[in-house]
A protein has these predicted regions:
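C-terminal soluble interaction/assembly domains
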Residues: 367, 386-403, 408-410, 426-432
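Low-complexity, Gly/Ser/Thr/Pro-rich intrinsically disordered linker/tail segments
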Residues: 424, 428-460
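Active-site-proximal beta-strand/loop segments in catalytic clefts of secreted hydrolases
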Residues: 257-261, 296-300, 326-328, 360-364, ...
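Bacterial N-terminal signal peptides that target proteins for export
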Residues: 1-8
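Gly/Ser/Thr-rich loop/hinge elements
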Residues: 302-360, 398-402, 412-416, 422-423
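Extended C-terminal subregions enriched in glycine
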Residues: 356-378, 383-391
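Hydrophobic h-region of N-terminal signal peptides that target proteins for export
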Residues: 11-19
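Flexible, low-complexity junctional segments that flank or bridge functional domains
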Residues: 21-328, 335, 399-401, 456-459
Length: 460
């Protein structure tokens, strides 16, 4: 339901806690933005993905018995994702929160299911095309940035659709419609065809040579080894399924490598991962403090934004605004957004580091790696960024299902700095531009970004 960074949630559960609460939540609820409608009956919820012309059932889920202060109801999908609902000011307004998200979603009571849901959109080439094209029209955030006339794209491709269009032809049509975006947070997946389509921003794919899976298995360790051999003093200590790594460059400089913001715990879902992260940070920052710290997210594939906020809290000396998140709120007007949902960085009372920091970034700093970088921008003293622009994808992925069972996703949110700046498409720029893992440097075992970081910290 709604969106979740680099994972798709297709079943949503909202239910009531106990008897008087059940009656207060029973009924139909529509999200502000996100294109979701929820039908609550007792302890069961049915979810629908809705556009102006289509309706696709999204699944069902059940209430779970978790009574936590501030929550009116807690619920769980069949996949194990946890959501909760809380009061929103009136009996016809609530707030829904996905535990892996840094923001909330407003839901409002409506009299009944939309008329378009009386008959779910059929699994035909025409029906699948309508769901795909309308969802993009109503939710994608970057048509103007990508200089795309979506209505024209739809008109051109609709003529290719007939009742006899094959699944392979349909996939190729959909892929061709969104290929020019070169947006890492867009994808199509067809398990029956064993096909999936996703892309990186042009010019940033140079680090990934060939298959993405092969790069993660062999390419990533090879690139990380360049830094380890040239600069790291002794073996790195590892936590959170090796996603958090820490060591020293020298007696004065700590080195924190964050490979992702997900997969921190094999059990316990998001909460289990947060517990594992906090324990790792306790261990790291309970050591004698170095004079300076290098944070390396040059290879970071994203995950859950709140984990990044938790790390930022260990580095903050005072409270500040990390970012404000908005989502497209109108199916026609691209300039209408949901009310801003601010995320604050509040200094943690647990062990941390308040001294000088340099952050290493690059084109494979992706998604939650970028929101983490954005969350560090307001920190005092300033964290100097060294490397290349990040990938330029910040929104959670709005996951959707087609009537034929295929999945697709797109970004529908914008993360804004306190002055309203967003970095979609271009990424966050470094303060000091240095090539990241250039072929010649990798071949010779050099890491010029790390060299520049140490030079800078030596003068702090």
């Amino acid at each position: 339901m709604f969106s979740h960074r680099f994972s798709i949630i297709f079943a949503v559960a909202i239910a009531a806690i106990a008897s008087p609460r059940i009656s207060s939540l029973d009924g139909v609820w529509r999200s502000l933005g996100y294109g979701e409608v929820l039908e609550i009956k007792g302890s069961q919820v049915k979810s629908f993905e809705v556009t102006a012309t289509t309706c696709v059932p999204d699944g069902t889920a059940q209430r779970v018995d978790m009574q936590i202060a501030g929550r009116e109801a807690t619920f769980k999908t069949a996949e194990g994702s946890v959501f909760f609902i809380r009061a929103g000011g009136t009996s016809d307004h609530r707030v829904l929160h996905n535990e892996g998200s840094a923001s909330d979603v407003r839901i409002d009571r409506i009299p009944s299911l939309p008329a378009v849901c009386s008959d779910p959109t059929p699994d035909t080439p025409e029906g699948n095309f309508e769901v795909f094209s309308r969802t993009w029209a109503e939710h994608y955030i970057s048509f103007d940035l990508k200089k795309t006339d979506w209505a024209k794209v739809v008109e051109t491709n609709r003529t290719k659709i007939t009742p006899k269009t094959t699944p392979t032809e349909l996939f190729d049509i959909f892929d061709g419609m969104i290929a020019p975006f070169n947006d890492t947070h867009t994808f199509i997946s067809a398990s029956n065809l064993k096909r999936e389509s996703s892309r990186l921003r042009p010019g940033t794919e140079r680090l990934i040579k060939g298959d993405h899976g092969e790069f993660r298995r062999k390419g990533v360790p090879a690139l990380l080894a360049v830094t380890d051999r040239a600069y790291v003093k002794g073996p790195l200590r590892k936590w959170c399924n090796d996603q958090i790594q820490y060591g020293h460059i020298d007696d004065a400089t700590g080195y924190l490598r964050i490979i992702s913001f997900s997969g921190y715990s094999k059990e316990g879902g998001f909460a289990g991962g947060l517990g594992a992260l906090e324990a790792a940070l306790d261990a790291i920052f309970s050591e004698p403090a170095p004079r300076g710290l290098v944070i390396d997210v040059r290879i970071n594939f994203g995950g859950d934004d709140p984990y990044g906020l938790a790390i930022a809290a260990r580095l903050a000396g005072s409270e500040y605004l990390a970012y404000t998140k908005v989502a497209r709120a109108d199916p026609v007007d691209r300039n209408k957004w949901t009310p801003g949902d601010p995320s604050l960085v509040r200094p943690s009372p647990r062990p941390g580091f308040r001294g000088p920091i340099v952050e290493l970034i690059g084109p494979l700093t992706i998604s939650a790696g970028e929101t983490f970088t954005q969350a560090l921008m307001g920190r005092t003293p300033h964290i100097t960024r060294i490397g290349e622009n990040t990938q330029g994808v910040f929104s959670d992925v709005l996951g959707r299902r087609l009537p034929n069972g295929w999945h697709f996703g797109l970004p529908n949110e914008v993360f804004r700095t306190p002055d309203g700046t967003a970095f979609d498409g271009i990424g966050i720029a470094p303060d000091i531009r240095v090539p990241v893992f250039a072929d010649d440097d990798v071949a010779s075992g050099n890491d010029p970004a790390m060299a520049e970081a140490l030079k800078l910290l030596s003068h702090k």
